[in-house]
Amino acid sequence: MTRCIVLGRFQPFHLGHARLVEAAVNHADGDEVVVAIGSAQAGWEANNPWTAEERQAMVEAWANSTGNNVTVVLIDDINDPPNWVEHAATTHGDGRLVTSDGPTAELYRAAGWEVHDVALSERETLEGWRVRQSVRMLSTVMDDEAARTVLAASVPEAVIEWLIQNDAMFRCSTFESGVHAG
């Protein structure tokens, strides 16, 4: 049994994230899986449309729908990579990082952590900025079935339902800044 940590912004929680968390659940083999939501102070902006609490609700909606038991924690970003791991670990605690992000893996390894690398899944489709642009495109389409159909390729059903039920897509139509890939 290995306590596992999955770290991300989850803007929004998409199918790539779901596969990563599922890999952590399998790797943990019954131990705790912590989903650590970074940039917790961010929200209501083009590259971070949803607040930490909203992202937590998305993760929990997905986890409840799949029967995956996870603990969600929120971590403010300090924009200081050399000190990030120590800062984040005070919130997410000890364990093994499960990630598909090379730079994050390097930071954690340099700090002495064990890291379980997971291959990226459908990166061309499942990049956060691409998913956010799909949500933005749908944000003024007042047709829930159209939103479900389009987002199903990249977002778990429970998260789509959360976005619809909480009217959490429309805000994306109001952001002025351009696309940020990353």
Model segments located where?
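Nucleotidyltransferase catalytic core that binds NTPs
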Residues: 1-182
